[in-house]
Amino acid sequence: MTQEFEHLSVLLAETVAGLNIRPDGIYIDGTFGRGGHSRKVLEELGPNGRLIAIDRDPQAIAAAEQFKDDSRFQIVHGGFGQLADYVEDLGLKGQIDGVLLDFGVSSPQLDDAERGFSFLRDGPLDMRMDNSQGETAAQWLARAEIEDMAWVFKTYGEEKNSRHIARCIAADREKAPFLRTKDLADLIARITKNKERNKHPATRVFQAIRIYINSELEQIDQALEGALAVLAPEGRLSVISFHSLEDRMVKRFIRRNSQGESVPHGLPITEAEINKSRKLKAMGKAIKPSVEEVERNARARSSVLRIAERLPYEA
């Protein structure tokens, strides 16, 4: 029997409110998960509205069965980085009224030890979002060079001890391969001297491996550009990030597309001409969860929501 894990959608009301739902609009939930955000969007859509959800996790696709009788809903099995391709295949490019992206790992993924995402639960070192394809974390750790591991840990996990940890992994795998999450987490805890308060020593390394295995930052970049390409004028983009690497990408993307093209000083270009190149308008400042939400759901603590609106296309 399949074990069920509860998932609480983060910043639910704020994220959907940011989409400014129109009853007959067309919306994308690029990270379906267990359907919390999708359910809220469907509640606000009218009978002629439409929601296209995307997820590469087979368990998320199975969870989408809850909406099988709702003709306004459809699910696509794939990565959110390809959302523009899916929209183009449906003939809806430039007609999307809102795109929602939640970059967090869902609670069911973290809580299911068999998925291998958690350093707190012993399970196989997998970490693939789509566990039907691709290289597992264990396979990568078995073959990666010390320099490659150190680069991944530092770049994707901002781990200060990246090189030391990489060397220790390489030394230990000579005795036995790393096949279980507990083996890797225990090694990192054992060799880490300056431990951060209230943070497991393996947090950054596990994050880094997960990001690398799933090409998450590349997917995020493609998803943001894809959302910009498919949104209709005045369409909204609501994006939830969970760590600084993600949030910096989102912040810079919105800023870059809301400021217009930079031109060398002195060129005879008017403000109006520069404004034509602006594609987005930031909708207020970043939104963080309330104290009450964090008390209900500790995993919401690091979440950040940013909202932007698509400006009219250049004539």
UniProtKB/Swiss-Prot annotation:
This one is known as Ribosomal RNA small subunit methyltransferase H
Give its localization.
Answer: Cytoplasm
State the UniProt keywords alphabetically.
Answer: Cytoplasm, Methyltransferase, rRNA processing, S-adenosyl-L-methionine, Transferase
Q: Which HAMAP family match?
A: 16SrRNA_methyltr_H (MF_01007)
Its taxonomic placement starts with: Bacteria, Pseudomonadati, Pseudomonadota, Gammaproteobacteria, Alteromonadales
Where is this protein primarily located?
cytoplasm
Q: List the disulfide bonds.
A: none
Q: Which residues bind S-adenosyl-L-methionine?
A: G35, G36, H37, D55, F80, D102, Q109
Set out the biological process GO terms recorded for this chain's protein.
Answer: rRNA base methylation
The similarity annotation says: Belongs to the methyltransferase superfamily. RsmH family.
Reaction it catalyzes: cytidine(1402) in 16S rRNA + S-adenosyl-L-methionine = N(4)-methylcytidine(1402) in 16S rRNA + S-adenosyl-L-homocysteine + H(+)
Look up and give the organism this protein is from.
Answer: Shewanella pealeana (strain ATCC 700345 / ANG-SQ1)
The record's GO CC annotations read: cytoplasm
What's the Enzyme Commission number for this chain? 2.1.1.199
Q: Provide any one GO MF term from the record.
A: rRNA (cytosine-N4-)-methyltransferase activity
Purpose of the protein? Specifically methylates the N4 position of cytidine in position 1402 (C1402) of 16S rRNA.
Q: Mind telling me which SUPFAM superfamilies this protein's record contains?
A: Putative methyltransferase TM0872, insert domain, S-adenosyl-L-methionine-dependent methyltransferases
What is the uppermost EC class here?
Answer: transferase
